[in-house]
Amino acid sequence: ADPFVEEDPTLQPVAGDYAIRVKLASRSNMEGIWVGFPDSGEYIDSNHPDELLLGLDSLQAESLSECIALEVDCCLPHLTGILDQYDSASELVRHAIDFGYVWAEQGQGAPHWLDKWQAVLELEDCHRLDLALDLAQNLQHYEFFPRGMDLAAYGRELAVRNGVIPPSRLITYAFDGAAYAEANMGQYGLSTTDHGYVAWNGGERRYEYSQPEHHSPALSI
């Protein structure tokens, strides 16, 4: 059965084991059980993770349409009031699953990815889960400099990434990374956040999860 369309261990994960947890309840289990993402099981299915199937089994529910969400616990403190942002447990869990995958991938190893994501969330005054998912897919449209960075080292790293210099150790160390980093910071007029310095670079952002009426008036334009 497809739990999104219309199915005995009760997992109670310790806080911190998951990027996001949703407490679901059903007529058969009004106290509810926690389901967490990303799924850590051996069987990986983006639509029906083990964690969700085990949760539905514990709730004696065939689908999420038979469930209600009671609580949400998210690892990013900037995202608040998530439970009130959704009309159905099904949509909430869909987005929680995707959030778990975004968290697990961490930008496929891109440097400073998590700090950049959190800096963008702060810049855009984002408190919604759906908008956070969209911003995670639009990070290439933001310039970012981490806090506490070695300006010269980061400037060299940025120059290689931007194709300004080849990834040659000899050329890289001879390059004035500090001047390049400072020039980029000045060009974009970066804002200061708790996780670094960030600004929208003017690229066209695409939105898959969030609706325009839920975008903050502060969204950079």
Where are these predicted regions, by residue range?
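Mixed-charge (acidic/basic) macromolecular-recognition segments
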Residues: A1-L11, G41, D45-R169, Y173, ...
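Short, extreme N-terminal segment that most often corresponds to the first beta-strand
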Residues: E6-E42, L219-I221
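Generic structural hydrophobic/aromatic packing signal, biased to beta-strands
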Residues: V22-L24, V35, L53-L54, A132-L135, ...
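Short, flexible beta-strand-to-coil junctions
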Residues: K23-M30, D57-L59, T193, N201-G202
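Residue-level signal for functionally critical sites in structured catalytic/ligand-binding pockets
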Residues: A25-N29, L151-R156, V160, R169-L170, ...
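Generic alpha-helix signal with a bias toward terminal, lower-confidence helices
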Residues: W34-G36, N47, L170, Q187, ...
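Long, highly charged low-complexity segments enriched in Glu/Asp and Lys/Arg with interspersed Ser/Thr
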Residues: A178, E182-S216
